[in-house]
Protein backbone atom coordinates (compact mmCIF):
# COMPACT_ATOMS: atom_id res chain seq x y z
CA UNK A 1 0.00 0.00 0.00
CA UNK A 2 1.26 3.47 -0.91
CA UNK A 3 2.52 5.40 2.18
CA UNK A 4 1.58 8.66 0.44
CA UNK A 5 -2.05 7.53 0.51
CA UNK A 6 -1.75 6.72 4.23
CA UNK A 7 -0.47 10.25 4.87
CA UNK A 8 -3.41 11.87 3.10
CA UNK A 9 -6.00 9.60 4.71
CA UNK A 10 -4.60 10.29 8.18
CA UNK A 11 -6.50 13.58 8.00
CA UNK A 12 -10.25 14.09 8.14
CA UNK A 13 -12.58 13.58 5.22
CA UNK A 14 -13.00 17.17 3.86
CA UNK A 15 -16.71 17.60 4.54
CA UNK A 16 -16.46 21.35 5.27
CA UNK A 17 -14.68 21.96 1.98
CA UNK A 18 -17.40 19.98 0.20
CA UNK A 19 -20.13 22.03 1.90
CA UNK A 20 -18.51 25.24 0.70
CA UNK A 21 -18.24 23.87 -2.83
CA UNK A 22 -21.92 22.96 -2.84
CA UNK A 23 -22.82 26.45 -1.60
CA UNK A 24 -20.83 27.92 -4.49
CA UNK A 25 -22.59 25.57 -6.90
CA UNK A 26 -25.96 26.77 -5.59
CA UNK A 27 -24.89 30.35 -6.18
CA UNK A 28 -23.70 29.50 -9.69
CA UNK A 29 -27.14 27.97 -10.32
CA UNK A 30 -28.78 31.33 -9.65
CA UNK A 31 -29.39 31.16 -5.89
CA UNK A 32 -28.65 34.19 -3.71
CA UNK A 33 -25.78 32.65 -1.72
CA UNK A 34 -27.74 32.51 1.52
CA UNK A 35 -29.65 29.87 3.46
CA UNK A 36 -29.26 26.48 5.13
CA UNK A 37 -28.45 23.17 3.45
CA UNK A 38 -30.22 20.24 5.12
CA UNK A 39 -29.47 16.55 4.57
CA UNK A 40 -30.47 13.32 6.31
CA UNK A 41 -28.49 10.10 6.48
CA UNK A 42 -29.92 6.65 5.95
CA UNK A 43 -32.43 5.56 8.57
CA UNK A 44 -32.26 2.23 10.34
CA UNK A 45 -34.85 -0.03 8.72
CA UNK A 46 -35.95 -3.46 9.83
CA UNK A 47 -36.21 -6.34 7.40
CA UNK A 48 -39.72 -7.61 6.75
CA UNK A 49 -40.87 -10.44 9.02
CA UNK A 50 -37.65 -10.20 11.01
CA UNK A 51 -36.07 -8.50 14.02
CA UNK A 52 -32.87 -7.90 12.02
CA UNK A 53 -32.04 -4.55 10.44
CA UNK A 54 -31.58 -4.24 6.69
CA UNK A 55 -27.84 -3.94 5.89
CA UNK A 56 -26.91 -0.29 6.29
CA UNK A 57 -25.66 1.84 3.39
CA UNK A 58 -25.18 5.55 3.96
CA UNK A 59 -26.73 8.05 1.57
CA UNK A 60 -23.96 9.30 -0.68
CA UNK A 61 -24.98 12.96 -0.78
CA UNK A 62 -25.20 13.04 3.01
CA UNK A 63 -21.77 11.48 3.31
CA UNK A 64 -20.30 14.01 0.89
CA UNK A 65 -21.20 16.85 3.27
CA UNK A 66 -20.49 15.03 6.53
CA UNK A 67 -18.03 12.15 6.13
CA UNK A 68 -20.27 10.39 8.65
CA UNK A 69 -21.19 6.72 8.25
CA UNK A 70 -23.57 6.56 11.23
CA UNK A 71 -27.22 5.71 10.68
CA UNK A 72 -30.03 8.05 11.71
CA UNK A 73 -27.83 11.14 11.45
CA UNK A 74 -28.40 14.63 10.02
CA UNK A 75 -26.26 17.52 8.82
CA UNK A 76 -26.92 21.23 8.30
CA UNK A 77 -24.71 23.83 6.68
CA UNK A 78 -25.51 27.48 7.42
CA UNK A 79 -24.14 29.21 4.34
CA UNK A 80 -24.26 32.67 5.91
CA UNK A 81 -22.33 31.61 9.03
CA UNK A 82 -20.13 29.01 7.28
CA UNK A 83 -21.14 26.55 10.01
CA UNK A 84 -21.41 22.79 9.48
CA UNK A 85 -23.36 20.94 12.18
CA UNK A 86 -23.61 17.16 12.49
CA UNK A 87 -26.42 15.53 14.46
CA UNK A 88 -25.86 11.96 15.66
CA UNK A 89 -28.09 9.59 17.66
CA UNK A 90 -27.81 9.88 21.44
CA UNK A 91 -27.27 6.80 23.59
CA UNK A 92 -30.32 4.55 23.92
CA UNK A 93 -30.10 2.52 27.17
CA UNK A 94 -32.07 -0.33 25.59
CA UNK A 95 -29.51 -0.58 22.79
CA UNK A 96 -26.35 -0.09 24.83
CA UNK A 97 -26.62 -3.51 26.48
CA UNK A 98 -26.60 -5.14 23.04
CA UNK A 99 -24.31 -2.98 20.90
CA UNK A 100 -22.32 -0.91 23.37
CA UNK A 101 -22.11 2.85 23.74
CA UNK A 102 -22.46 4.85 20.52
CA UNK A 103 -19.99 7.50 19.45
CA UNK A 104 -20.21 10.56 21.69
CA UNK A 105 -20.38 14.15 20.44
CA UNK A 106 -16.85 14.75 21.72
CA UNK A 107 -15.52 11.71 19.87
CA UNK A 108 -17.39 12.67 16.69
CA UNK A 109 -15.90 16.17 16.72
CA UNK A 110 -12.43 14.62 16.65
CA UNK A 111 -13.32 12.28 13.78
CA UNK A 112 -15.44 14.42 11.45
CA UNK A 113 -14.64 17.70 9.71
CA UNK A 114 -17.56 19.65 11.21
CA UNK A 115 -17.88 22.68 13.49
CA UNK A 116 -20.45 21.35 15.95
CA UNK A 117 -21.84 17.93 16.90
CA UNK A 118 -25.26 17.71 18.55
CA UNK A 119 -27.76 14.95 19.39
CA UNK A 120 -30.12 14.12 16.55
CA UNK A 121 -33.02 14.96 18.85
CA UNK A 122 -32.10 18.66 18.52
CA UNK A 123 -32.50 19.00 14.75
CA UNK A 124 -35.80 20.89 14.77
CA UNK A 125 -34.72 23.13 17.63
CA UNK A 126 -31.54 24.07 15.79
CA UNK A 127 -33.43 24.77 12.56
CA UNK A 128 -35.68 27.10 14.51
CA UNK A 129 -32.64 28.67 16.18
CA UNK A 130 -31.21 29.51 12.73
CA UNK A 131 -34.24 31.73 12.21
CA UNK A 132 -34.41 33.26 15.70
CA UNK A 133 -32.72 36.53 14.72
CA UNK A 134 -35.11 38.11 12.24
CA UNK A 135 -32.49 40.60 11.06
CA UNK A 136 -29.98 37.95 10.00
CA UNK A 137 -32.01 34.78 9.66
CA UNK A 138 -31.54 32.60 6.56
CA UNK A 139 -34.70 32.88 4.49
CA UNK A 140 -34.35 29.61 2.65
CA UNK A 141 -33.59 25.97 3.39
CA UNK A 142 -32.30 23.66 0.66
CA UNK A 143 -33.32 20.01 0.83
CA UNK A 144 -33.79 16.97 -1.43
CA UNK A 145 -37.30 15.64 -2.18
CA UNK A 146 -38.19 12.33 -0.52
CA UNK A 147 -35.10 12.62 1.68
CA UNK A 148 -36.73 14.40 4.63
CA UNK A 149 -38.51 12.51 7.41
CA UNK A 150 -42.02 13.59 8.47
CA UNK A 151 -40.77 14.72 11.91
CA UNK A 152 -38.58 17.46 10.43
CA UNK A 153 -40.14 20.90 10.07
CA UNK A 154 -39.02 23.79 7.89
CA UNK A 155 -41.79 26.12 9.09
CA UNK A 156 -39.39 28.75 10.52
CA UNK A 157 -38.05 29.43 7.02
CA UNK A 158 -39.72 31.69 4.48
CA UNK A 159 -38.98 29.28 1.65
CA UNK A 160 -38.02 25.65 1.09
CA UNK A 161 -36.16 24.92 -2.14
CA UNK A 162 -36.45 21.29 -3.25
CA UNK A 163 -35.18 21.77 -6.79
CA UNK A 164 -31.47 22.56 -6.86
CA UNK A 165 -29.58 20.86 -4.01
CA UNK A 166 -29.28 17.34 -5.44
CA UNK A 167 -28.02 18.62 -8.78
CA UNK A 168 -25.55 20.98 -7.08
CA UNK A 169 -24.08 18.14 -5.00
CA UNK A 170 -23.89 15.85 -8.02
CA UNK A 171 -22.03 18.49 -10.02
CA UNK A 172 -19.51 18.85 -7.19
CA UNK A 173 -19.09 15.09 -6.84
CA UNK A 174 -17.94 14.80 -10.46
CA UNK A 175 -14.59 16.47 -9.71
CA UNK A 176 -12.59 14.75 -6.98
CA UNK A 177 -10.26 16.40 -4.48
CA UNK A 178 -6.97 14.97 -3.23
CA UNK A 179 -8.60 13.11 -0.34
CA UNK A 180 -11.20 11.46 -2.56
CA UNK A 181 -8.57 10.40 -5.08
CA UNK A 182 -6.57 8.88 -2.22
CA UNK A 183 -9.65 6.88 -1.15
CA UNK A 184 -10.17 5.67 -4.71
CA UNK A 185 -6.52 4.73 -4.98
CA UNK A 186 -6.67 2.75 -1.74
CA UNK A 187 -9.80 0.94 -2.96
CA UNK A 188 -7.87 0.07 -6.12
CA UNK A 189 -4.82 -1.08 -4.15
CA UNK A 190 -6.93 -3.44 -2.08
CA UNK A 191 -8.82 -4.73 -5.10
CA UNK A 192 -5.52 -5.34 -6.91
CA UNK A 193 -4.49 -7.68 -4.09
CA UNK A 194 -7.82 -9.49 -4.39
CA UNK A 195 -7.55 -9.82 -8.18
CA UNK A 196 -4.05 -11.23 -7.81
CA UNK A 197 -5.28 -13.72 -5.22
CA UNK A 198 -7.96 -14.91 -7.65
CA UNK A 199 -5.43 -15.19 -10.49
CA UNK A 200 -3.08 -17.26 -8.36
CA UNK A 201 -5.85 -19.58 -7.19
CA UNK A 202 -7.72 -19.86 -10.48
CA UNK A 203 -5.82 -22.85 -11.89
CA UNK A 204 -6.98 -25.15 -9.09
CA UNK A 205 -10.44 -23.70 -8.44
CA UNK A 206 -13.35 -26.04 -9.05
CA UNK A 207 -16.26 -23.58 -9.05
CA UNK A 208 -16.87 -19.88 -9.71
CA UNK A 209 -18.04 -19.35 -6.13
CA UNK A 210 -14.61 -20.33 -4.77
CA UNK A 211 -13.07 -17.43 -6.66
CA UNK A 212 -15.74 -15.03 -5.42
CA UNK A 213 -14.99 -16.16 -1.86
CA UNK A 214 -11.27 -15.52 -2.36
CA UNK A 215 -11.93 -12.06 -3.74
CA UNK A 216 -14.28 -11.06 -0.93
CA UNK A 217 -12.09 -12.45 1.84
CA UNK A 218 -8.96 -10.76 0.49
CA UNK A 219 -10.76 -7.42 0.39
CA UNK A 220 -11.94 -7.89 3.96
CA UNK A 221 -8.41 -8.78 5.08
CA UNK A 222 -7.23 -5.40 3.79
CA UNK A 223 -10.12 -3.51 5.46
CA UNK A 224 -12.47 -3.26 2.50
CA UNK A 225 -15.67 -4.30 4.24
CA UNK A 226 -18.09 -3.70 1.38
CA UNK A 227 -18.04 -4.61 -2.28
CA UNK A 228 -18.63 -1.78 -4.73
CA UNK A 229 -21.07 -4.12 -6.50
CA UNK A 230 -21.73 -7.83 -6.68
CA UNK A 231 -18.56 -9.55 -7.97
CA UNK A 232 -18.75 -11.15 -11.41
CA UNK A 233 -16.95 -14.49 -11.78
CA UNK A 234 -17.96 -15.68 -15.24
CA UNK A 235 -16.28 -18.76 -16.72
CA UNK A 236 -16.47 -19.37 -20.46
CA UNK A 237 -19.77 -18.49 -22.12
CA UNK A 238 -21.03 -16.89 -18.90
CA UNK A 239 -18.75 -13.97 -19.74
CA UNK A 240 -21.12 -13.03 -22.56
CA UNK A 241 -23.59 -11.82 -19.91
CA UNK A 242 -22.36 -8.35 -18.98
CA UNK A 243 -23.45 -8.42 -15.33
CA UNK A 244 -23.48 -12.17 -14.70
CA UNK A 245 -23.66 -12.80 -10.95
CA UNK A 246 -24.76 -16.39 -10.46
CA UNK A 247 -21.13 -17.33 -9.72
CA UNK A 248 -21.92 -20.99 -9.10
CA UNK A 249 -20.86 -22.96 -12.17
CA UNK A 250 -18.20 -25.65 -12.11
CA UNK A 251 -15.02 -24.58 -13.88
CA UNK A 252 -14.24 -27.74 -15.88
CA UNK A 253 -16.33 -28.38 -18.97
CA UNK A 254 -18.49 -31.43 -18.09
CA UNK A 255 -17.96 -32.97 -21.56
CA UNK A 256 -14.42 -32.06 -22.63
CA UNK A 257 -12.87 -31.34 -19.23
CA UNK A 258 -11.42 -28.12 -20.66
CA UNK A 259 -10.90 -25.11 -18.41
CA UNK A 260 -12.00 -21.95 -20.26
CA UNK A 261 -11.17 -18.34 -19.49
CA UNK A 262 -12.72 -16.42 -16.61
CA UNK A 263 -14.06 -12.88 -16.82
CA UNK A 264 -13.66 -11.34 -13.37
CA UNK A 265 -15.27 -7.94 -12.80
CA UNK A 266 -14.96 -7.03 -9.12
CA UNK A 267 -13.96 -4.15 -6.89
CA UNK A 268 -13.82 -3.56 -3.18
CA UNK A 269 -15.01 -0.35 -1.56
CA UNK A 270 -12.95 1.68 0.90
CA UNK A 271 -14.63 4.18 3.22
CA UNK A 272 -17.54 4.65 0.84
CA UNK A 273 -15.38 4.99 -2.31
CA UNK A 274 -15.49 2.40 -5.07
CA UNK A 275 -13.21 0.53 -7.41
CA UNK A 276 -14.28 -1.20 -10.62
CA UNK A 277 -11.75 -3.54 -12.23
CA UNK A 278 -12.15 -6.23 -14.88
CA UNK A 279 -9.70 -8.81 -16.15
CA UNK A 280 -9.79 -12.03 -18.19
CA UNK A 281 -7.94 -15.04 -16.79
CA UNK A 282 -7.06 -18.36 -18.52
CA UNK A 283 -8.20 -20.94 -15.99
CA UNK A 284 -5.96 -23.60 -17.53
CA UNK A 285 -2.91 -21.36 -17.30
CA UNK A 286 -2.92 -20.51 -21.00
CA UNK A 287 -5.45 -18.71 -23.20
CA UNK A 288 -6.98 -20.74 -26.01
CA UNK A 289 -6.01 -19.40 -29.47
CA UNK A 290 -9.47 -17.86 -29.91
CA UNK A 291 -9.55 -16.32 -26.43
CA UNK A 292 -6.06 -14.87 -26.90
CA UNK A 293 -7.05 -13.30 -30.23
CA UNK A 294 -10.04 -11.58 -28.64
CA UNK A 295 -7.98 -10.59 -25.60
CA UNK A 296 -5.43 -8.88 -27.83
CA UNK A 297 -8.17 -6.93 -29.62
CA UNK A 298 -9.70 -5.72 -26.35
CA UNK A 299 -6.35 -4.72 -24.90
CA UNK A 300 -5.62 -2.79 -28.11
CA UNK A 301 -9.00 -1.07 -27.77
CA UNK A 302 -8.12 0.04 -24.25
CA UNK A 303 -4.58 1.16 -25.01
CA UNK A 304 -5.63 3.23 -28.02
CA UNK A 305 -8.39 4.85 -25.95
CA UNK A 306 -5.83 5.66 -23.25
CA UNK A 307 -4.00 7.70 -25.89
CA UNK A 308 -6.98 10.05 -26.12
CA UNK A 309 -7.72 10.54 -22.42
CA UNK A 310 -7.12 14.08 -21.17
CA UNK A 311 -9.12 17.13 -20.15
CA UNK A 312 -11.25 18.63 -22.90
CA UNK A 313 -11.71 15.41 -24.88
CA UNK A 314 -15.26 14.40 -25.83
CA UNK A 315 -16.08 11.00 -24.34
CA UNK A 316 -18.24 10.12 -27.36
CA UNK A 317 -15.09 10.35 -29.50
CA UNK A 318 -13.15 7.99 -27.22
CA UNK A 319 -16.04 5.52 -27.31
CA UNK A 320 -16.18 5.74 -31.11
CA UNK A 321 -12.45 4.99 -31.31
CA UNK A 322 -12.97 1.82 -29.26
CA UNK A 323 -15.53 0.63 -31.81
CA UNK A 324 -13.21 1.40 -34.72
CA UNK A 325 -10.38 -0.61 -33.13
CA UNK A 326 -12.79 -3.50 -32.44
CA UNK A 327 -13.97 -3.45 -36.05
CA UNK A 328 -10.42 -3.57 -37.38
CA UNK A 329 -9.56 -6.52 -35.14
CA UNK A 330 -12.72 -8.48 -35.96
CA UNK A 331 -12.21 -7.88 -39.69
CA UNK A 332 -8.66 -9.21 -39.40
CA UNK A 333 -10.01 -12.37 -37.76
CA UNK A 334 -12.61 -12.78 -40.50
CA UNK A 335 -15.59 -12.47 -38.15
CA UNK A 336 -16.63 -9.21 -39.80
CA UNK A 337 -16.40 -8.51 -43.51
CA UNK A 338 -16.72 -5.31 -45.49
CA UNK A 339 -15.04 -1.92 -45.28
CA UNK A 340 -14.23 -0.73 -41.79
CA UNK A 341 -15.97 2.61 -42.38
CA UNK A 342 -19.16 0.96 -43.62
CA UNK A 343 -19.17 -1.42 -40.66
CA UNK A 344 -18.82 1.55 -38.31
CA UNK A 345 -21.59 3.55 -39.97
CA UNK A 346 -23.93 0.54 -39.90
CA UNK A 347 -23.16 -0.03 -36.20
CA UNK A 348 -22.33 -3.70 -36.72
CA UNK A 349 -19.74 -3.65 -33.94
CA UNK A 350 -22.53 -3.01 -31.42
CA UNK A 351 -23.38 -6.71 -31.79
CA UNK A 352 -20.02 -7.50 -30.16
CA UNK A 353 -19.49 -4.38 -27.99
CA UNK A 354 -22.99 -3.39 -26.82
CA UNK A 355 -22.20 -1.25 -23.78
CA UNK A 356 -20.57 2.11 -23.15
CA UNK A 357 -16.80 2.48 -22.85
CA UNK A 358 -16.97 3.62 -19.23
CA UNK A 359 -18.50 5.85 -16.60
CA UNK A 360 -17.69 8.22 -13.77
CA UNK A 361 -16.62 6.59 -10.53
CA UNK A 362 -16.57 7.82 -6.95
CA UNK A 363 -18.84 6.93 -4.05
CA UNK A 364 -21.00 5.08 -6.55
CA UNK A 365 -19.54 2.63 -9.02
CA UNK A 366 -21.63 4.30 -11.71
CA UNK A 367 -21.15 7.72 -10.19
CA UNK A 368 -23.39 10.73 -10.68
CA UNK A 369 -23.07 13.52 -13.23
CA UNK A 370 -22.55 11.45 -16.38
CA UNK A 371 -25.58 12.90 -18.19
CA UNK A 372 -26.46 9.70 -20.09
CA UNK A 373 -29.06 9.66 -22.84
CA UNK A 374 -30.64 6.22 -22.84
CA UNK A 375 -33.17 7.47 -25.42
CA UNK A 376 -30.43 8.06 -28.00
CA UNK A 377 -31.66 6.43 -31.24
CA UNK A 378 -28.09 5.44 -32.16
CA UNK A 379 -27.47 2.03 -30.50
CA UNK A 380 -23.72 2.70 -30.50
CA UNK A 381 -24.19 5.55 -28.01
CA UNK A 382 -27.46 4.56 -26.29
CA UNK A 383 -25.84 2.89 -23.29
CA UNK A 384 -23.05 5.41 -22.71
CA UNK A 385 -23.28 6.37 -19.03
CA UNK A 386 -21.01 9.36 -19.67
CA UNK A 387 -21.66 12.06 -22.26
CA UNK A 388 -19.74 15.30 -22.65
CA UNK A 389 -16.13 16.41 -22.27
CA UNK A 390 -13.65 15.31 -19.63
CA UNK A 391 -12.35 17.65 -16.92
CA UNK A 392 -9.30 17.46 -14.63
CA UNK A 393 -9.74 15.28 -11.51
CA UNK A 394 -12.75 13.43 -12.84
CA UNK A 395 -12.37 9.68 -12.35
CA UNK A 396 -13.53 7.43 -15.18
CA UNK A 397 -13.43 3.75 -16.05
CA UNK A 398 -12.15 2.62 -19.43
CA UNK A 399 -13.63 -0.83 -20.03
CA UNK A 400 -13.82 -1.98 -23.65
CA UNK A 401 -15.03 -5.49 -24.34
CA UNK A 402 -15.85 -7.99 -27.06
CA UNK A 403 -18.61 -10.52 -26.39
CA UNK A 404 -20.22 -13.46 -28.11
CA UNK A 405 -23.77 -13.31 -26.79
CA UNK A 406 -26.27 -15.22 -28.91
CA UNK A 407 -29.20 -13.11 -27.70
CA UNK A 408 -27.51 -9.95 -29.00
CA UNK A 409 -25.76 -11.27 -32.12
CA UNK A 410 -28.45 -13.55 -33.59
CA UNK A 411 -30.78 -10.66 -34.60
CA UNK A 412 -27.88 -9.31 -36.67
CA UNK A 413 -27.43 -12.74 -38.28
CA UNK A 414 -31.14 -12.79 -39.18
CA UNK A 415 -31.19 -9.22 -40.49
CA UNK A 416 -31.43 -8.97 -44.31
CA UNK A 417 -29.41 -5.75 -44.12
CA UNK A 418 -26.74 -6.64 -41.56
CA UNK A 419 -26.15 -10.40 -41.85
CA UNK A 420 -23.86 -9.93 -44.85
CA UNK A 421 -21.31 -8.21 -42.62
CA UNK A 422 -20.82 -11.24 -40.31
CA UNK A 423 -19.21 -14.51 -41.37
CA UNK A 424 -21.17 -17.03 -39.30
CA UNK A 425 -18.80 -19.88 -40.14
CA UNK A 426 -15.86 -18.00 -38.63
CA UNK A 427 -18.02 -16.73 -35.78
CA UNK A 428 -18.84 -20.31 -34.75
CA UNK A 429 -15.26 -20.79 -33.54
CA UNK A 430 -15.62 -17.94 -31.03
CA UNK A 431 -18.92 -18.57 -29.21
CA UNK A 432 -17.08 -20.53 -26.52
CA UNK A 433 -14.93 -17.49 -25.66
CA UNK A 434 -17.96 -15.88 -24.04
CA UNK A 435 -16.59 -12.41 -23.45
CA UNK A 436 -13.44 -10.44 -22.71
CA UNK A 437 -13.44 -7.11 -20.92
CA UNK A 438 -10.46 -5.17 -19.55
CA UNK A 439 -11.20 -2.29 -17.17
CA UNK A 440 -9.04 0.25 -15.37
CA UNK A 441 -9.85 3.34 -13.27
CA UNK A 442 -8.29 6.62 -14.42
CA UNK A 443 -7.96 10.10 -12.92
CA UNK A 444 -8.20 12.63 -15.76
CA UNK A 445 -5.45 15.28 -15.78
CA UNK A 446 -4.92 18.35 -17.92
CA UNK A 447 -2.55 16.55 -20.28
CA UNK A 448 -3.40 12.88 -19.75
CA UNK A 449 -4.36 10.64 -16.86
CA UNK A 450 -3.21 8.76 -13.77
CA UNK A 451 -4.09 5.07 -13.79
CA UNK A 452 -5.16 3.94 -10.32
CA UNK A 453 -5.38 0.28 -11.36
CA UNK A 454 -2.26 -1.89 -11.06
CA UNK A 455 -3.64 -5.38 -11.75
CA UNK A 456 -1.49 -7.06 -14.45
CA UNK A 457 -3.05 -7.31 -17.90
CA UNK A 458 -0.20 -8.30 -20.21
CA UNK A 459 -1.39 -11.67 -21.51
CA UNK A 460 1.88 -13.50 -20.90
CA UNK A 461 2.20 -12.08 -17.40
CA UNK A 462 -1.36 -13.11 -16.54
CA UNK A 463 -0.61 -16.63 -17.78
CA UNK A 464 2.54 -16.81 -15.64
CA UNK A 465 0.62 -15.77 -12.53
CA UNK A 466 -2.12 -18.35 -13.14
CA UNK A 467 0.45 -21.07 -13.75
CA UNK A 468 1.76 -20.65 -10.19
CA UNK A 469 -1.31 -22.67 -9.23
CA UNK A 470 -1.63 -22.06 -5.49
CA UNK A 471 -4.56 -23.85 -3.79
CA UNK A 472 -7.85 -22.07 -4.25
CA UNK A 473 -9.12 -22.94 -0.78
CA UNK A 474 -7.89 -25.07 2.09
CA UNK A 475 -10.91 -26.10 4.14
CA UNK A 476 -10.56 -27.60 7.59
CA UNK A 477 -12.93 -30.44 8.40
CA UNK A 478 -14.25 -30.96 11.92
CA UNK A 479 -12.67 -34.42 11.65
CA UNK A 480 -9.24 -32.80 11.27
CA UNK A 481 -9.42 -31.04 14.63
From Swiss-Prot:
Keyword Ribonucleoprotein carried by entry: no
What is the catalytic activity of this protein? Release of any N-terminal amino acid, including proline, that is linked to proline, even from a dipeptide or tripeptide
The protein's GO terms of the molecular function aspect are: manganese ion binding; metalloaminopeptidase activity
Pfam families recorded: AMP_N, Peptidase_M24
Write down how the cofactor binds this protein: Binds 2 manganese ions per subunit.
Q: What class of enzyme is it?
A: hydrolase
Which keywords does the record carry? Aminopeptidase, Hydrolase, Manganese, Metal-binding, Metalloprotease, Protease
Highest taxon of the source? Eukaryota
- Cofactor(s) it depends on: Mn(2+)
Give the binding site residues for Mn(2+) 2.
265, 276, 439
Q: Which GO terms describe its biological process?
A: proteolysis
Residues that coordinate or bind Mn(2+) 1: 276, 399, 439
What's its EC?
A: 3.4.11.9
Q: Does the keyword Cytoplasm apply?
A: no
Q: Member of which family? A: Belongs to the peptidase M24B family.
Briefly, what is this protein's role?
A: Catalyzes the removal of a penultimate prolyl residue from the N-termini of peptides.
- Protein name (Swiss-Prot/TrEMBL): Probable Xaa-Pro aminopeptidase PEPP
Q: What is the originating organism of this protein?
A: Uncinocarpus reesii (strain UAMH 1704)
Lineage runs: Eukaryota, Fungi, Dikarya, Ascomycota, Pezizomycotina
Amino acid sequence: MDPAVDKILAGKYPAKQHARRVAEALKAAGQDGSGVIYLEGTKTRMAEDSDEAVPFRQRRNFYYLSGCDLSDSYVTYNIDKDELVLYIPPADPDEVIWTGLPMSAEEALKVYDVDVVLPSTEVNAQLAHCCANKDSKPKRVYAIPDRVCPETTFLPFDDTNWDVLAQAIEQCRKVKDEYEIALLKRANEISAQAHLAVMKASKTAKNERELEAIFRSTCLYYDSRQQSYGPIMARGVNGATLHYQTNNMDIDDPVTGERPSLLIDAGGEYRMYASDITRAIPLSGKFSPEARQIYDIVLDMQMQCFGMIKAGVAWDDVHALAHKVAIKGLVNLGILRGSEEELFQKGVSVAFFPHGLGHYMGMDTHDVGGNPNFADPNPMFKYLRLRGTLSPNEVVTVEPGVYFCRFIIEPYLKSPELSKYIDSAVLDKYWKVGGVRIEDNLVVTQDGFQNLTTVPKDAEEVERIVQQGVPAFVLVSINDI
